[in-house]
């Protein structure tokens, strides 16, 4: 297993380097000049001041040299300075990362648990009204845009019913501590986490249902039933365990999409995570901050995929890492 993990880390480093190079040039070649944006905000749009800003931040250097200096900085865990906020990019990201991790991990748990539960029930009651209801529900959430789910949730639970706060990470000026603070954050977390969770739940429910129905037709399930095992035991020990492999694969593939969904959700709910930070950096043409967020998000996706491969081994012990 250690050799497998080491190989994946090396491959991940190569992929991460390719992502850095690609995004570096894409961001630099995009329309807009951060020096012009900063000069305009400072109220000094003359060309001399713009030139001084470009020299200060190294934007006047050739792109290959800028890339070399950036990669060299990453090797020492230095993501550079934010052009707009004049703060180390790593500090800005670390300040926002806990909020994003809390949101994405909660949403992932909701989507996976609800998806597997509903998919299992749909497979067990295949062909009945319950199966139809679950399938229709999954299709509705799957076909609805993420931002629309977020807006409808705000209108229903915040505006109409006044049950939940509509934006932010915590109540501004409340100064809660201990359990009260946890409950306050939890109340703010419910809507954004459920928005992402329900969107991805639909995919997991459909995949679980289809996979379980396929496994049910295999010979080893018929053998288990011939031995007199109860339906509950067959479903839990044999069908569900083997049906989870495609779901685990899909969960690994969705890691990048989950972070992408966080960008939209954090923007709608004003959730102070790195998704919203990415959106702000894009509007401000803050190259270093935008690229730093890309690097961190890419690293998170690679780590998540590695964890997915390890979970494979837990779900199916027959998988050999040395293969």
Describe each PLM feature range.
Residues 2-4, 93-130, 159-162, 173-323:
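Alpha-helical transmembrane segments of integral membrane proteins
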Residues 6-12:
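N-terminal signal-anchor/signal peptide hydrophobic helix marking the start
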Residues 9, 49, 53, 63-79, ...:
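Hydrophobic alpha-helical segments of integral membrane proteins
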Residues 12, 20, 43-44, 112, ...:
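Residue-level recognition of pore/gate-forming positions within transmembrane alpha-helices
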Residues 16-68, 161-182:
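Hydrophobic alpha-helical transmembrane segments of membrane transport/permease proteins
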Residues 22-29, 57-58, 70-72, 137-167, ...:
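Membrane-water interface segments at the C-terminal ends of transmembrane alpha-helices
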Residues 40-58, 135-144, 191-197, 233-250:
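Hydrophobic alpha-helical transmembrane segments
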Residues 59-116:
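An internal, D/E-rich "acidic patch" concept
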